Amino acid sequence: GGILKFNPKNPRWEERDRFIISKGHGAISLYPILADLGFFDKSELGEVCKESSFLGGIPDTMIPGFETINGALGHGLGVACGSAVALKNKNSAAKVFVLMGDGELFEGAVWEAIMFAGHHQLNNLILIIDNNKISMLDYCRNIIDLTPIEEKLHVFKWKVKTIDGHNIEEVYDSLNSLKEDKSDHPRVLIANTIKGKGVPKLENDVLCHIKSLKEDEIIKAIEELK
């Protein structure tokens, strides 16, 4: 796609760009992409979450293409800061990308990482916030009101851009622009999204975060997304 530098035949290539998925429960959505790119055989996709498979429900470094092991949310950005500092110390041109859910902003460790990155001018760090405004069991505004996110990040010396997270062309162009930016600031792309978009039964429904669909509902959802 032209944004991330990587080598499926050598996943630990030193000059690769790092992609850290902090919202680890989204890892399963990356498996088909990694298989398409050649990180592992597509036949493995039929074994996801089985005892014999290395493809589990959350990221793991034993999976080619993943940089971190994820458990509790809120740790990805701190790890990314460490990677960004290490790459700077090596004078590497590689970038560190992090995908984080907006609910992770409830965690104090995230704001420590935000302050750290701004203070140390980690301009090789690009954060993407999936701003769907829903946490596991409620709307974010009912748990801790995060607004205005943009102003908060500006104060901590981040370069901020807000986009429609469902507009793929806008996502691509914005990431490319932030990667090529020469300023001394870490960058953040706030992607406004709607959870479950395109499937009426799930769209903007708090419970769709943890809801399992029946087989007939899955078939219907696939048709609605076409």
Predicted regions mapped to residue ranges:
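Short acidic, glycine/serine/threonine-rich loops at helix termini
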Residues: 31-33, 60, 109-111, 137-141, ...
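Cofactor-binding active-site loop characterized by glycine-rich and histidine/acidic residues
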Residues: 1-119
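Glycine/aspartate-rich loop-and-adjacent alpha/beta segment that forms the canonical ThDP
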Residues: 168, 172-226
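Hydrophobic alpha-helical scaffolding
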Residues: 20-23, 139, 143, 161-164, ...
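Thiamine diphosphate
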Residues: 65, 69-180
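Generic beta-sheet signal
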Residues: 17-19, 94-98, 125, 183-193
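Short, glycine-/Ser/Thr-/acidic-enriched flexible segments
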Residues: 26-27, 37, 132, 168, ...
